[in-house]
Amino acid sequence: MFDQIAGGRTDAVFEYLGSGNPVDSTDAAGVSLIRWCAYYGDVSAIKFLLANGESLDALGANFDLNGVSFHGHWQLCQFLIEQGADVNRPLPGTLETPLHAAFCKSDQPVFDLVADVLLAAGADPNSTTAPAVPTGSFMRDCRTKAETPLHRAAAYGGENAIRMLLDAGAAVDARDMNGDSPLSWASWHQRPAHILAMLCFGQHTIHPEAAQQSARERAAGWRGMEKSLAGTPTHGPAMSEPR
């Protein structure tokens, strides 16, 4: 049954514990039940494990909020923040924050929701990574560049996420270790004109008609059902009391 859980059937933790197995069980590689549930973003399964004696500390430092943000689980991000995870705690070495981790994959609207949750909880949109430190955020042979979350969002984020960062005070003219701005990153990654227009500053401009045409073409992209199935974060009293 553990193999089923590790394969994504995290609902099986209820039967697994009901059969008398320990709450801190691990697979052959030492990965625990709660870590598998976090990998798949199953808040209900995690709550069940906690009610049976497991601890969020088993997820690692800061309840692995960076990892959860990286995987796009906004619901679990919100739960972990309610339980005391620090949205501005950087990883040692790279100094990447959860907000940096939310912008490592391209063209996935669920990361807009992760950014929404993190920013609502006070994430700093101008935090910077360390310069030239190897990072696993892009899986292989990559180093940080003293970049802000907006730099990464310029390359990989959606229009909504970029707007949220700007509205939260992200510096559009921030420079990384190479002197590149978010507009530079967007240009390197050949982002569409309406994204480039959001990041222009100083002498840099995009023709309004090009931006409008780009936005019209983009409107035919993400489907309504895809957005609906991702859910909608709400910001009010915490749904879960800290344990």
What are these regions (language model features)?
Residues 147-200, 205-206:
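Ankyrin-repeat and related helical/solenoid repeat scaffolds used for protein-protein interactions
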